[in-house]
């Protein structure tokens, strides 16, 4: 009995088999991604697809400075408000920046017809030529062109008027009928602006135009309108009870525009030959101008990013990422990051891909850890790692390329009377934005799930590759590890890793060692059977002796009567 127990203990203590484990890389990364099934999965490597930073400045777009309107708005700039004089020399720009609460617009109160449409037209203009459509000194010889000034458009403390319009008044006690035409020979669209004055009383009408009833007619191929002044008392705005309504039209190349009036005409002085630039736009921003360059400008600031998505602002100008409402869009490129505690088991095995990854393997994503008499070490499987890197890199680049449709997205213009239309447009835009956000998030979730499954599959394939080579020359001991039935030196280990393991060479040694181990198992089973029988017999004898002693004691003190019948 003692000899058999000694054999078992010696067999267990002498076992120090060579092992090889399959596992994957782990590191100290704290990157987390979401998948379809899980949230906040820690991974070894990932790429961010969502830009959330900007510089807070207005920058040059592709080397061209923007037109910063400062204290002026579009109306003040294009009409020629004298307080916007510094802007008149600007001929080209990358985009137009307007502040939310600009002070200088229409200095003389009145209605600006189709103002939102004009803004929309100017948002696609990148430069223009400002020219005299009707020169001031020689176009109106029978009308006064200097007395049409007002305190509401004062400049440097003096009454003045718009720099692109002329207020024609009576001259020498009369206001003759006028007729003036312009033929567009600029070979591009020309923006023409004019106004109609509406006095507050008949006395002003007679004083300025020398007649009670007047009209203004403007005609071109695409425009035909006749205006009649509306004389009425009105509340004073900027000290004025009168009003000027402002109008505009786009004159096509070769077209003619004709002005006829017998009073109340605010005549064009300067017009604009427009050059369209579809990368331009108008943004409303409080950001300050800086000496910087960008490819994408938002009202919040410039974005310099090649990422496909951004969550900074929906209004963008230039080559910009698509705006989404997401707060996180991170795509996994590496593996699940679950570093294992590398503790030695009974046979010195390192925890494999089941418990977690290896921080000791730094030169690849998947690989091996071996242990034999010559030592132990990690080695990456370069082929499977490189194939995985190539596949995932191509996938990430493809996703970015497909989703990275960079473009300008400017806000639409609506006047105060079009509130219902603006609300409807906002709902439509919100719907499209929700769809874009959903599509972007779903794409990332699905691709993350596929990538992690792809890595799991690669580790499993590597495991099956080793298993198919070793066959019954080794046994699976869990944790992604195999224990050899034969001695496997470094050359042998290398052959397993590169797929050239010689199974027949080691099969005889493995067979003998398997039989020895199986014999030890049989011997140990015999020992366990003897111990079980001995334990059963001994327990039965103890039980019988105990029952006999109790019975004798009870009979001796009368507690139990014993009768023997013959």
Curated annotation (Swiss-Prot):
Post-translational modification here is noted as: Palmitoylated.
Pfam families from the UniProt entry = Hemagglutinin
Q: Where is the lipid attached (S-palmitoyl cysteine)?
A: 555, 562, 565
- GO biological process, alphabetically ordered: clathrin-dependent endocytosis of virus by host cell; fusion of virus membrane with host endosome membrane; fusion of virus membrane with host plasma membrane; viral budding from plasma membrane; virion attachment to host cell
Enumerate the GO terms in the molecular function aspect.
host cell surface receptor binding
Q: Which Gene3D superfamilies match?
A: 3.90.20.10, 3.90.209.20, Hemagglutinin Chain A, Domain 2
- Disulfide cysteine pairs (residue numbers): 21-481, 59-292, 72-84, 107-153, 296-320, 488-492
Task: Identify the keywords attached in UniProt to this record, alphabetized.
Answer: Clathrin- and caveolin-independent endocytosis of virus by host, Clathrin-mediated endocytosis of virus by host, Disulfide bond, Fusion of virus membrane with host endosomal membrane, Fusion of virus membrane with host membrane, Glycoprotein, Hemagglutinin, Host cell membrane, Host membrane, Host-virus interaction, Lipoprotein, Membrane, Palmitate, Signal, Transmembrane, Transmembrane helix, Viral attachment to host cell, Viral envelope protein, Viral penetration into host cytoplasm, Virion, Virus endocytosis by host, Virus entry into host cell
Q: Which residues cross the membrane?
A: 530-550
Q: Which residues form the signal peptide?
A: 1-17
Q: Give membrane topology per the record.
A: Single-pass type I membrane protein
Name the predominant localization: virion
Instruction: List the glycosylation sites.
Output: 27-28, 40, 104, 144, 172, 177, 286, 304, 498
Give the subcellular location.
Virion membrane; Host apical cell membrane
Q: Where is this site: Cleavage?
A: 344-345
Its biological function?
A: Binds to sialic acid-containing receptors on the cell surface, bringing about the attachment of the virus particle to the cell. This attachment induces virion internalization of about two third of the virus particles through clathrin-dependent endocytosis and about one third through a clathrin- and caveolin-independent pathway. Plays a major role in the determination of host range restriction and virulence. Class I viral fusion protein.
Q: What does the miscellaneous comment read?
A: Major glycoprotein, comprises over 80% of the envelope proteins present in virus particle. The extent of infection into host organism is determined by HA. Influenza viruses bud from the apical surface of polarized epithelial cells (e.g. bronchial epithelial cells) into lumen of lungs and are therefore usually pneumotropic. The reason is that HA is cleaved by tryptase clara which is restricted to lungs. However, HAs of H5 and H7 pantropic avian viruses subtypes can be cleaved by furin and subtilisin-type enzymes, allowing the virus to grow in other organs than lungs.
Under the subunit heading, UniProt states: Homotrimer of disulfide-linked HA1-HA2. Interacts with human CACNA1C.
- What is this protein called in UniProt? Hemagglutinin
Q: Please tell me the species this chain comes from.
A: Influenza A virus (strain A/USSR/90/1977 H1N1)
